[in-house]
């Protein structure tokens, strides 16, 4: 067999798998990770959101002058963690799946930011509990990494319509895209 035909056969063997990888893997990767950064309304700063659909995690970096914070929304475990830079503490809470936007909602909203089509805003209030979390590893790597080196506390979602019996100045106001506002209220013990 001439050398030319061997090269052609080898080339065919390489092309077929390359086409399969391109057809199946590339679209899957596109669906797995989505990121975007955009200016915040009414504030100086930006919010960067990264969606990892495969792991079920949304990471948020908000460098607003009014309320700088980082966050993780772990959809597989229904957990929300927020690192509040003004309080130098982390807060961990159970996410109510009915109240939070889905991963698909967030991914679609990231694509619509430039056009200004936003879903309605919802607000939730959480109260910080005095118990400090000792073992962050049990809540997964994204939350452990986010809250490393700062005290971390549990927070409980307030039922809608219940009045807060605490100082409103103790609340940190967070915004997630235009989906929802979160208020995390209460004194952080030891600070």
Curated annotation (Swiss-Prot):
Disulfide bonds: 90-147
PROSITE patterns assigned to the protein according to its UniProt record, in alphabetical order: BRICHOS (PS50869)
Gene3D superfamilies cross-referenced by the UniProt entry: 3.30.390.150
Compartments where found: Secreted
InterPro entries: BRICHOS_dom, Gastrokine
Signal peptide as annotated in the record: 1-30
Residues covered by the BRICHOS domain: 63-155
Domain of life of the organism encoding this protein: Eukaryota
Residues carrying covalently attached carbohydrate according to the record: 33
Gene Ontology terms: biological process: negative regulation of epithelial cell proliferation
Keyword Secreted: yes
Outcome recorded upon mutating residue 147 to G: Impaired secretion
GO cellular component labels: extracellular space
Tissue note: Expressed in stomach. Present in mucus cells at the base of antral glands, and Brunner glands of the duodenum. Present at lower levels in the mucus neck cell region of the fundus (at protein level).
Main location: secreted
Keyword annotations from UniProtKB, A to Z: Disulfide bond, Glycoprotein, Secreted, Signal
Effect of residue 171 to G: Impaired secretion
Its job: Inhibits gastric epithelial cell proliferation.
Family under the similarity heading: Belongs to the gastrokine family.
Protein name: Gastrokine-3
Species, as recorded: Mus musculus (Mouse)
